[in-house]
Regions:
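ATP-dependent carboxylate/acyl-activation modules
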Residues: 1-6, 96, 181-510
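Short gly/pro/ser/thr-enriched loop/turn and capping motifs at secondary-structure boundaries
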Residues: 34-37, 52-58, 104-106, 128-131, ...
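Glycine-rich nucleotide/cofactor/substrate-binding loop typically near the N-terminus or early
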Residues: 33-103
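Active-site/ligand-binding-proximal alpha/beta "capping" segment
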Residues: 77-124, 131-134, 384, 388-393
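Hydrophobic beta-strand scaffold residues
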Residues: 28, 45, 140-142, 346, ...
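N-terminal glycine-/serine-/threonine-rich phosphate-binding loop
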Residues: 1-51
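Mobile "lid/hinge" segments at catalytic clefts and subdomain interfaces of large enzymes
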Residues: 136-149
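Non-catalytic interaction/clamp surfaces of large macromolecular machines
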Residues: 146-147, 151-199, 320
Length: 510
């Protein structure tokens, strides 16, 4: 008679699974709470103590760590000496192990959990049985996921045993299960002990991608086990083609921009750089201003807003070729309009503010860099002014807006704004003057030549950017400060009647 050992914390689907085994003539060995559930449902089982001849002790900490359990699992059926040993010791074979582990991850996720609670939810016997069964996969079926119950039962009913291929896959899945479990425990204990010299990351495949950044590159999208709501991994795709690698990069950049704004805000991005952005009293006005900021670059880009997307905005977007539209919600009328663009990807994202402690990981050859995300949003005040000319109230609004935008432009980054709208963006140049020239020329080409505000993500190392800005109608500048030549930049600003604010914070983006 075939025997199965059952000991689970996640009891979903268990009664049906074990009932199926019983119908096939299997004998069921069960532990503690698992046995009670099965007995309560009229399924006859054998207690683990009846198999081992030893009682469960230490409040259940020791119950399956016994040769009569592990011998029955690990014995290789094709080796006569193994089978002879089992017979001599009175050990029966165990042909299927159905085990999942104490809910450690769920326990530590609870508010106010104590270390004592966490420790009591570290499984010892469970992982041992899982690993033993997974090691002997040629003879033993290991089932640690209720999602596999149906497959296992179907094969047992059809063939009397599971296939080699199924057992191998279940073995790999089991080792993944125990590895994830131990990694979670190790991470928790290392945090408690103040140890940080190792990094464990755990992600699940969310979707394979057609290709990577370029067609000759392979790519996949992995998601954190518990992604924060304000993320692409948590986003709901309402319509459109599957997201591509570049779509995901751009959409992620868009979310990072949007999260910095509380007023109605709209941003258009291309290659992860804002090309048009605006805040306004309404989301319709913000969209119109962002679109007017750069009607050329928005083509083939993505647009994100931080308010419900309404029909009027959707109607404005309809004639434009866009890859993605992102919003916290959409009116039915807006979705109806956007639905006419079948390939347009429409993403709904919960825009609840982030906790601010998210980590960013960048792969490098032979290693990985880790840093906290740059979620810092500085509050600019007139007291930050370092020049004789003090900012007006309107300039302060533009300085604040420009500072938030330039943070999300690739360095060296310059943003030129007016009326809380971008009028020029200079990104990714190897010198700051080059980025300034690009942004300022965009503003001039748009016919905006007076009352401009310039924002720089890094300090101005010389006074040349200040002098250049003045020629294009810039009257106020915001920058981190911190150069050994700050005095030169301040003197030039004073000479030209320009207001300058030092934030004391740099926002490089590579």
């Amino acid at each position: 008679m075939k025997r199965a050992l059952v000991s689970v914390s996640d009891k979903s689907g268990l009664v049906e699974f074990v009932s199926g085994l019983k119908e096939l003539g299997w004998e069921i060995i069960a532990t503690g709470g698992t046995r009670k559930l099965l007995d309560d449902n009229g399924i006859q089982t054998i207690g683990i103590s009846d198999v081992t001849g030893f009682p469960e002790i230490l409040d259940g900490r020791v119950k399956t760590l016994h040769p009569k359990v592990h011998g029955g699992i690990l014995a290789r059926r094709e080796l006569p000496e193994h089978m002879r040993t089992l017979e001599e010791q009175g050990i029966g074979t165990i042909d299927l192990v159905c085990v999942n582990l104490y809910p450690f991850r769920q326990t530590i996720a609870k508010e106010g959990v104590t270390m004592a609670d966490a420790i009591e939810n570290i499984d010892i016997g469970g992982p041992s049985m899982v690993r033993s069964a997974a090691k002997n996969w040629k003879d033993v079926t290991i089932v640690c996921d209720p999602a596999d119950y149906g497959t296992v039962l179907a094969e047992l009913k059809a063939c009397g045993r599971t296939s080699d291929d199924t057992r191998l896959k279940l073995s790999a899945k089991a080792y993944t299960h125990t590895a994830e479990y131990d990694m979670c425990i190790a991470t928790y204990m290392r945090e408690k002990a103040g140890l940080n010299e190792k990094l464990f990351l755990e992600y699940d495949l969310k979707q394979p991608l057609r290709y990577g950044e370029n067609p000759h590159q392979n790519a996949k999208f992995f998601a954190a086990l518990r992604p924060e709501p304000y993320s692409l991994a948590f986003a709901k795709q309402i319509q459109g083609k599957e997201l591509s690698y570049n779509n995901i990069q751009d959409a992620n950049a868009a979310l990072n921009v949007v999260r910095d704004f509380e007023q109605p805000f709209c941003v258009a991005l291309k290659h992860m750089n804002p090309c048009g952005a605006a805040v306004a009293d309404t989301i319709e006005k913000a969209w119109q201003e962002a679109y007017e900021a750069d009607k050329v670059s928005i083509y083939g880009g993505i647009v994100a807003v931080n308010r419900e997307l309404i029909a009027e905005v959707a109607a404005g977007m309809k004639p434009i070729f866009l890859e993605i539209v992102i919003a916290p919600s959409f009116t039915p009328e807006a979705l109806e309009i956007l639905s006419s663009k079948k390939n347009l990807r429409v993403l709904q994202v919960d825009m609840t503010p982030s906790s601010g402690d998210d980590m960013q990981y960048i792969s490098v050859n032979g290693g990985m860099l880790a840093q906290t995300l740059d979620t810092s949003v500085e509050v600019l005040t007139p007291e930050m002014c370092v020049t004789k000319q003090k900012p007006t109230e309107e300039q302060m609004k533009d300085l604040d807006f420009g500072w938030k935008i330039v943070k999300h432009v690739k360095s060296n980054a310059i943003a030129v704004v007016k009326g809380c709208r971008t009028v020029g963006v200079g990104a990714g140049q190897t010198n700051r003057v080059g980025s300034a020239e690009i942004a300022l020329n965009e503003a001039r080409n748009a016919g905006v030549t007076e009352g401009l505000v310039l924002a720089s993500d890094g300090f101005l190392p010389f006074d040349d950017t200040v002098a250049l800005a003045a020629k294009y109608g810039v009257t106020a500048i915001v920058q981190p400060g911190g150069s050994i030549r700050d005095a030169d930049a301040i003197a030039k600003a004073d000479e030209l009647g320009i207001t300058m604010i030092f934030t004391g914070v740099r926002h490089f983006k590579h």
